[in-house]
Amino acid sequence: MGKYINILDDLTINKIAAGEVVERPSSVVKELLENAIDSGATQVVVDITDGGKKCIKISDNGGGILSSEVEKCFLRHATSKIKSIDDLFDLYSLGFRGEALASISAVSNIEMVTKTKEEMIGTKIVLSGSKIIKKEPVGTKDGTTITVKDLFFNTPVRAKFLKSTHAETINISDLINKLAIGNPNVRLKYINNSKLMLNTPGDNKLISVIRSIYGKEITDNLIEVDYEDEKIKISGYIGNCLLYTSPSPR
């Protein structure tokens, strides 16, 4: 007997699609942190609890989102970064697909508080498993704060595949360090279980970020690289002969 073909409902589609975007807590941090940077933020705070499995909170002072547009953020393929395929050839943002918030909201409890400088009052929206629970005006400063709680609460099978809290924290820390190095113009503060882990100055100097991450001893033993010709430009830092990693014992 032949099998019937089922047309999946939007909720099921979002849960399946979330697996491609949200693999673990570090995936959530990556998408939200990149969104914050793309918003024009100069200051971003990342605050996680229990390796991001319990709570991920990211606040920025970027452009914010208009109250009339807030609900659209959580629709699949809804983005402010492109309008047509032609825009891809002149794209400088970190993301553009418009899948992140839809995927994250499908497998978590999420709250967004946002305000643009053009509006007198901000907007708060709360979703659980893609469903809008509440939307209301709220007093807040310019920018956006997104809080993601109980990741994979409605997909327990996926929650079982998460690593230990320590391992998930290491993944998040590594990701944040890389994004901090790539965006020295952004003051990035990273808090893990109420402990300050990183606080970059946002002075647009790569060496300042390196010092914040690796400390003074390593920074003092770096050599600046700066090369440019007609086709390529290379800049950065390499370690001198005093920096090395001991080989692992055999």
What are these regions (language model features)?
Residues 248-250:
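Positively charged, low-complexity/disordered segments
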Residues 2-246:
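N-terminal phosphate-binding caps/lids of nucleotide- and nucleic-acid-binding domains
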